C-alpha cells in the first residue's frame, strides 16, 4: 500500500535530528501510563483496558466477507524467495478448508471467544488477564503505530525479547499492518541480530530490555531499512531519536485512521508471507523460512486438532508460554493456535528455564503443555534428586507406584479400566507428584524439536504422564505428524496430520527412507535463497526433510536419524548415531550427553558428559554431580561427588563401570562396525552458552566436532602412524 497522503497519513522518517517524542508531554489518561513501567508495559494495565470499547474495528470489511476460497491471480509456482511473492497453495480434494488470513482467524475467534481471558501475565506477584477483545484492540493500535513509524509492505518487524503479551501484540499487529513477523533469539549476538535484521529488511525492531537495545544500537548503522526501535519492558537509559516506548508507539498510531489499517487488511491474501522463522544454521548463515498466512491459519487449526487441542466452547485450554517464540513450535503452539481455539496463554518468567518454570506451572495449572526433550529430562532429573533425598519409605513408595504404573501402561496402553493396584498407586503417590509439578489438570503433554530418549519416555509413563510427540520442521510450519490421547504409540512421532501427505524415498531393506512432506503446512521458500529452496522442494512440490524414518502398518512414523548426521565409516558402513547414543544413556544413568563419532573414520568413538547440577542463576552446568549420578558412583564403589574428581583423577571405579556399560551396548549391536571402540568423558556438560546446544537445546554436532577436535583426533592418532 503506498505511503503518504494517498493513505491519509504520513510516515515518520528516520531522522537523527528529529525531536524525540518523549519531549512532548504524555497524556497519562489517554495512554494509560503507569508509574511502574520499568516492570511491564502499561498497555496491559487492567484499569486502562477495562475502559476500552470493543466496538472499534470489529466489523469485518466487505472485501474480507466477499473473499472466496479461490485466490485472485494465484501464482503457478509452489515456491518463491521474494518477501512480496505469492505461491500456489497445495489444495487437496480431501481437504476442503478454505484459505483464510490471520485477521480473518482472529475476527472469527472474537465472535466466539471475545469475552474470554486470552493472555495471563504476572504483575507485582499477582496474575492479571486480558480478554480477546482487548487483545485484538491493542494489536490494532500497535499495527497503526508500526505504520506511522514507516513499516512497508513485505518488510519485517523483528522482535527480540522474552515471551510476553507485548511479543504477541507486536506479532499480530505486524501481520495486520501488512508486515512480516521475524523473531530473534534473545541469546543472539549483535552480529547474528545484524544478519537477520538486514536479511529480512526490518523497518522496526521491538526489544524488551536495555541489554537487547544495546545490541541494536551497536549495529544500527549497518541496517539501512531500520527506521525505529520500540522497547517495552524497561525504559531507555536516555532520550534517543527513533527509539520509542510501547506507549509512545500507541500514541503515534492514533494519527493513522482506522480506515487506513482496514484498507491494508482488506488487500491481504492467504498465499502471502506473514512470518519469517530463521533456522539456527549449523553451517553458514541461518536461512529465513517464509511462512504464508495460510501456513499459519491452516496449521493452527488442523495441526492442533490432530493433537486433540480443544476449542474453548468445549474446554478452554490453558497453556504456559516459556519456550522461545522465535522457534516455530512455540510460536504455533502458544500464539497462533491460542487465537484459533480461544486458549488462555499465561507467560512464565524470563528465567523459567533456570528453575522457576515449575512455580508457574503450579500457579497456572495448564491443561496442555509442551516442552523440548531437554526440559522433560531436567524435570526427570529433579524428581530423581528429590526422591534420593527423601526418606526410605517415601522413596520405596514412589518406586513401587512407578513400577506398577509403567507395567500397566506398557502392557495395556489404551485400557481405561485400570487394575486396582494401578489406581491405588496413582491415588496414594503419583497424583501428588503431578500436583507438585503443576500437572494436576494437564491432559496433554507434548514434546518435539529433538529426539527423546526411551529412558525419559518410560520415566514419565511411570508417573502416568504420557508424552505425545509431534514431528515437523520450520519448513512445515511445525507439526506435520502429531500424537494425541487417541493417536498414540510409544516411541513414535504420531501419524500424519489429516489433509497432509508423506512419502519415504530411497528406502532400504528395513523400510527406512528419507521423509518427504506435502500439504498446506509446507513453507513458501527460503528468503533470498533460490538454490537452497530448490534443494529443499523438488519439482513436484515435495519437501525433502533430510530426516530418515519408517512407517509402520498403521501409519505411525518412527524417526531413525538425519541424512546429514548419518555416519559413513571408512569401511562404507552407514551408522545412524541416535539409537547408539540413546542405548548408552539408557545403560549408564550417569551419562548426560553422548555423541557418536566416526564419519570417514575406521571405527566409532564417543564423547560423553556426566549429569551435573545447574547453576540456579545462570543455568550453566556446574562441577557437582546430580543425586542420580552420585548414586551411580556409590553403587560402583566410588566416593566422587564432582565431575572434576572423576575426570581429573580418572576415577577407576567409574571409568570401569562406563567401560562395562559400553561393552554391553556393543554386545547388542547389529554388527562389529557398530561397536564403540574408544570414548572420553568431557570436563563440562553440553550447554547453550558453550555452543554445543542450540536455543531449543538440540545438539549441534558440527560445533562439537570442531570444539573437541583435539580429543577426537587423539582417538585415531594410532591409525595415522
From Swiss-Prot:
Documented EC number(s): 6.2.1.3
For biological process, the GO terms are: long-chain fatty acid metabolic process; response to glucocorticoid; very long-chain fatty acid metabolic process
- Spell out the residue ranges making up region: Disordered: 1-64
Give UniProt keywords alphabetically.
Answer: ATP-binding, Cell membrane, Cytoplasm, Cytoplasmic vesicle, Endoplasmic reticulum, Fatty acid metabolism, Ligase, Lipid metabolism, Membrane, Microsome, Nucleotide-binding, Phosphoprotein
Q: Compositional bias (Polar residues) spans?
A: 26-52
Residue(s) carrying Phosphoserine: 34, 50, 53, 70
Compartments in which it is found: Cytoplasm; Cytoplasmic vesicle; Microsome; Endoplasmic reticulum
Q: What Gene Ontology terms describe what this protein does at the molecular function level?
A: ATP binding; long-chain fatty acid-CoA ligase activity; very long-chain fatty acid-CoA ligase activity
What is known about what this protein does? Catalyzes the conversion of fatty acids such as long-chain and very long-chain fatty acids to their active form acyl-CoAs for both synthesis of cellular lipids, and degradation via beta-oxidation. Can activate diverse saturated, monosaturated and polyunsaturated fatty acids.
Protein name, per record? Long-chain-fatty-acid--CoA ligase ACSBG1
User: Which source organism does the UniProt entry give?
Assistant: Mus musculus
Amino acid at each position: 500500500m503506498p505511503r503518504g497522503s494517498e493513505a491519509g497519513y504520513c510516515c515518520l522518517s528516520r531522522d537523527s535530528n528529529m525531536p524525540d517524542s518523549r519531549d512532548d508531554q504524555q497524556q497519562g489518561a489517554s495512554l494509560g501510563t503507569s508509574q511502574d513501567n520499568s516492570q511491564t508495559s502499561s498497555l496491559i494495565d487492567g484499569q486502562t483496558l477495562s475502559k476500552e470499547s470493543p466496538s472499534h474495528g470489529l466489523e469485518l470489511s466487505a472485501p474480507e466477507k466477499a473473499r472466496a476460497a479461490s485466490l485472485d491471480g494465484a501464482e503457478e509456482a509452489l515456491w518463491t524467495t521474494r518477501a512480496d511473492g505469492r505461491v500456489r497453495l497445495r489444495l487437496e480434494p480431501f481437504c476442503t478448508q478454505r484459505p483464510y488470513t490471520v485477521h480473518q482467524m482472529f475476527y472469527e475467534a472474537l465472535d466466539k471467544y471475545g469475552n474470554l481471558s486470552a493472555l495471563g501475565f504476572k504483575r507485582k506477584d499477582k496474575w492479571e488477564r486480558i480478554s480477546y477483545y482487548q487483545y485484538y484492540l491493542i494489536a490494532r493500535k500497535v499495527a497503526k503505530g508500526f505504520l506511522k513509524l514507516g513499516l512497508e509492505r513485505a518488510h519485517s518487524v523483528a522482535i527480540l525479547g522474552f515471551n510476553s503479551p507485548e511479543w504477541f501484540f507486536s506479532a499480530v499487529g505486524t501481520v495486520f499492518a501488512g508486515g512480516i513477523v521475524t523473531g530473534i533469539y534473545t541469546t543472539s549476538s549483535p552480529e547474528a541480530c545484524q544478519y537477520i535484521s538486514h536479511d529480512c529488511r526490518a523497518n522496526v525492531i521491538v526489544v524488551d530490555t536495555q541489554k537487547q537495545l544495546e545490541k541494536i544500537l551497536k549495529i544500527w548503522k549497518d541496517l539501512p531499512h531500520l527506521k525505529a526501535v520500540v522497547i517495552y519492558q524497561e525504559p531507555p537509559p536516555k532520550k534517543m531519536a527513533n527509539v520509542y516506548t510501547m506507549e509512545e508507539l500507541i500514541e503515534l498510531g492514533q494519527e493513522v485512521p482506522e480506515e487506513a489499517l482496514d484498507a491494508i487488511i482488506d488487500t491481504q491474501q492467504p498465499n502471502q508471507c506473514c512470518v519469517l522463522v530463521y533456522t539456527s544454521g549449523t553451517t553458514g548463515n541461518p536461512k529465513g523460512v517464509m511462512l504464508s498466512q495460510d501456513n499459519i491459519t491452516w496449521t493452527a487449526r488442523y495441526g492442533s486438532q490432530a493433537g486433540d487441542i480443544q476449542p474453548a466452547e468445549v474446554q478452554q485450554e490453558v497453556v504456559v508460554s516459556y519456550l522461545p517464540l522465535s522457534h516455530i513450535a512455540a510460536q504455533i503452539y502458544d500464539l497462533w493456535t491460542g487465537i484459533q481455539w480461544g486458549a488462555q496463554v499465561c507467560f512464565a518468567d524470563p528465567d523459567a528455564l533456570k528453575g522457576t518454570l515449575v512455580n508457574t506451572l503450579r500457579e497456572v495449572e495448564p491443561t496442555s503443555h509442551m516442552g523440548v526433550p531437554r526440559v522433560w529430562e531436567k524435570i526427570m532429573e529433579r524428581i530423581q534428586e528429590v526422591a534420593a533425598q527423601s526418606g526410605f519409605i517415601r522413596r520405596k513408595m514412589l518406586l513401587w507406584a512407578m513400577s506398577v504404573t509403567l507395567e500397566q501402561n506398557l502392557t495395556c496402553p489404551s485400557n481405561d479400566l485400570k487394575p486396582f493396584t494401578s489406581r491405588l498407586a496413582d491415588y496414594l503417590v503419583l497424583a501428588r507428584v503431578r500436583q507438585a509439578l503443576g500437572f494436576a489438570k494437564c491432559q496433554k503433554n507434548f514434546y518435539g524439536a529433538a529426539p527423546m530418549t526411551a529412558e525419559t519416555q518410560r520415566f514419565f509413563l511411570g508417573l502416568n504422564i504420557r508424552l505425545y510427540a509431534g514431528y515437523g520442521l520450520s519448513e512445515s510450519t511445525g507439526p506435520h505428524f502429531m500424537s494425541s490421547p487417541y493417536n498414540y504409540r510409544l516411541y513414535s512421532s504420531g501419524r500424519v496430520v489429516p489433509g497432509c501427505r508423506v512419502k519415504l524415498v530411497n528406502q532400504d531393506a528395513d523400510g527406512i527412507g528419507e521423509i518427504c512432506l506435502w500439504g498446506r503446512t509446507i513453507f513458501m521458500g527460503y528468503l533470498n535463497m533460490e538454490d537452497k529452496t530448490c534443494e529443499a522442494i523438488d519439482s513436484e512440490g515435495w519437501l525433502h526433510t533430510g530426516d530418515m524414518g519408517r512407517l509402520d502398518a498403521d501409519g505411525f512414523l518412527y524417526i531413525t536419524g538425519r541424512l546429514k548426521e548419518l555416519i559413513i565409516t571408512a569401511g562404507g558402513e552407514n551408522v545412524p548415531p541416535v539409537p547408539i547414543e540413546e542405548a548408552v544413556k539408557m545403560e549408564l544413568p550417569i551419562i548426560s550427553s553422548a555423541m557418536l563419532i566416526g564419519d570417514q573414520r575406521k571405527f566409532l568413538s564417543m564423547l560423553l558428559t556426566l549429569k551435573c547440577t545447574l547453576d540456579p542463576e545462570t543455568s550453566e552446568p556446574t562441577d557437582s554431580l546430580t543425586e542420580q549420578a552420585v548414586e551411580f558412583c556409590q553403587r560402583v564403589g566410588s566416593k566422587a561427588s564432582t565431575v572434576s574428581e572423576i575426570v581429573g583423577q580418572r576415577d577407576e571405579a567409574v571409568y570401569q563401570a562406563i567401560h562395562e556399560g559400553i561393552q554391553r551396548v556393543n554386545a547388542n549391536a547389529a554388527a562389529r562396525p557398530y561397536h564403540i571402540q574408544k570414548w572420553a568423558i568431557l570436563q563440562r556438560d553440553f550447554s547453550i552458552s558453550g555452543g554445543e546446544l542450540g536455543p531449543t537445546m538440540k545438539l549441534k554436532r558440527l560445533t562439537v566436532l570442531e570444539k573437541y577436535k583435539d580429543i577426537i583426533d587423539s582417538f585415531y592418532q594410532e591409525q595415522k602412524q
